[in-house]
């Protein structure tokens, strides 16, 4: 029917607008990062596998991480800078950024990383420090 076609076009326009806004935001963010830093380290995450995970599903595909990483890669390369990819099996979240001890279990619901050495911080900040240090180690070799 005519109404169905009209509504389908409206939905398509909404999706196009969202796609355009996401792309614009990611371009601006990647530009700001490449202007500010000479070396950027990222975790080499398997986005396809995360998208198929029951816990994350479509939200992982909607965030545009793969597109963002590609933008960072080509912009850094274009400026003669470096993107360091940390292996996806590196225990960035489970490793203590102070003492180096690796936790055996760390659930996604645990938002604060607590170690027996007394280190206590946001788990994402702990992972970011570990990724930075692993990138430094990789570049030194």
Model-predicted regions and their roles:
Residues 1-141:
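Positively charged, helix-rich recognition surfaces that bind polyanionic ligands
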């Amino acid at each position: 029917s005519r109404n169905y076609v009209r509504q389908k076009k409206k939905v398509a326009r909404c999706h196009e607008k969202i796609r355009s806004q996401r792309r614009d935001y990611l371009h601006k963010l990647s530009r700001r990062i490449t202007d500010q830093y000479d070396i950027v380290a990222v975790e080499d995450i398997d986005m396809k596998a995360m998208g198929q995970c029951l816990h994350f599903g479509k939200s992982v595909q909607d965030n545009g991480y793969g597109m963002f990483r590609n933008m960072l890669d080509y912009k850094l390369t274009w400026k003669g800078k470096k993107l360091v990819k940390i292996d996806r099996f590196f225990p960035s979240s489970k490793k203590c950024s102070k003492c180096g001890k690796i936790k055996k279990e760390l659930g996604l619901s645990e938002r604060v990383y607590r170690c027996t050495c007394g280190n206590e911080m946001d788990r994402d900040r702990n992972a970011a420090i570990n990724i930075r240090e692993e990138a430094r180690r990789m570049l030194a070799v």
